[in-house]
Amino acid sequence: MKDLTLSRRSLFAASAATAGILAAANAGLGKVDFAKAEGGTITATCAYSSTNYSPIGCSSALMLGATWHVFEGLYELDLHDYTTYPALAAGEPEKVSDTEYKVTLRDGAKYSDGTDVVAADVVNAFELNMANDTYSAFLSFIDSVSAVDDKTVDFVLKFPFESLLQGRLAVVKIFPASISADDMNVSPIGSGPWAYSSLNGDDGGFIDFVPNEYYNGPKPATADAMHWDIQKDGTARTTAIMAQTSMVMEAVPDANVDAIQGAGATVEYKDGFSLPFLMFNTKKAPFDDKRVRQAFFYAIDVQKLIDNVMAGHANPVKSFLPESFANFHEASNVYTYDPEKAKSLLSEAGYADGIDVELLCNNNWVADLSIQIQNDLNAAGINTTLRTEAINWAELGESDDILPYDVMLTPGDPSCFGADPDLLMSWWYGDNVWTSGRSCWNHTEEWATLQDLMQQAREASGDEQQELWNQCFDLLSEEVPLYPLFHRQLATAYLADQIDGFVPIATTGLVFLDASVK
């Protein structure tokens, strides 16, 4: 375990070769004497693990949730409704022109080591994230970021982006520029209401938080401490909430809901974006034909999957976005169970005798869906062999060769970064590894058409923007290079008699920014 007994920024002036060196240095200097907030210890049991602790390009469910508490962006998203609010920013961006904005930092903003947050830190954080493979697509609208002075940051954009600006700026979390990217992965330090005191994100590990005594922003810590246990096993998490050794449990297994409620906990389901999807190798026949791809979605009895495997806690797909999202539009092609339609499409595509396919299934919760999917596909003339394993994503990068798979079943949920349609579509359909490798869809005219529509929507607003997004949703429902089977409801359990102000969110992660111990 990496013990992060955090001290002054001077500790990080030189890069340490190992976590052990840093831990020893920290131990020698002693802990910062953080001022404590009133009110005991918030406890939680998390469902995901990670050993990458850096906020740069952070995409793990565990550490993204942790960064919401330890770091700040210029603006932050309220994950309960995806509204934005100023965090490190003193207020709204100052519009210089359609493609230039200035942001002033909050007076007195400090990191948990007591040092000031300055504009150079913001510039450094944005530049590192703009160069990051994960976040670069989210930030492609930015041409340059510069420090006007210690308190003011200037953003020059490549094109107008006003309607989405604040939510997208919230993706980047700010940290001291004097700390190297490598050291941020060992001893991360931020300006948020909480600071790490110990950090071990392995399965079976834990994260301890203490209040940042220097925090002067809108969401101060409301407890003396916070402790997260990491338990990927659903039974272990269930035991913790039932024994009341944890106030909050992430990712409740449907089979355990009754027992958890019987032990006195509240279980709350939230409609969200989380989804299992089919992804096709579109450079490989017959999956280069959209009629074949469409046949899969008619062949699968999704409602039966929802009823039998998901215990009813999912919603059929009517579009790329779920109906609960503000920008929902019912797509031109809504798939319902129709095996005869599937057979007809295969016949139209020249495969009247059916096709043989290997379905590569990720070995996580979607594996429970695979047997019924296999049976449904077989019945529609799509003769399916299952291969269930941990996906080796390194094999699925951009290549001149045909990638080594036919069709994949795996889950995803980029709504932890935001809920605007451009961000969500950019994740899977943008100019990145999902389309240059993986689905290999970026060689098609339809992909180019989608990029043009998305770019027009970025520069638009209001009804015009929504209409352009609607065209995108329609196109995706027709082409289905990668498309959801259903949108999943996420279940969180909590002890309402022990924690106040906690509200579950509809994506991975836990938020305690307004929660306190009763």
Predicted regions and their residues:
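Alpha-helical secondary-structure segments
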Residues: 43, 118-125, 150-156, 193, ...
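N-terminal lobe/hinge region of extracytoplasmic solute-binding protein
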Residues: 45-96, 127, 189
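Gly/Pro-rich hinge or "lid" segments in bacterial periplasmic/extracellular proteins
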Residues: 78-83, 168-221, 225-227, 235, ...
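Surface-exposed binding/hinge segments that line
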Residues: 94, 104, 137-178
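Ligand-site clamp/hinge motif
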Residues: 214-259, 383
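Structural transition elements
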Residues: 315-348, 363-368
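Extracytoplasmic/peripheral linker and loop segments enriched in polar/acidic and small residues
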Residues: 383-395, 423-496
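Long beta-strand-rich cores associated with HINT superfamily self-processing modules
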Residues: 492-518
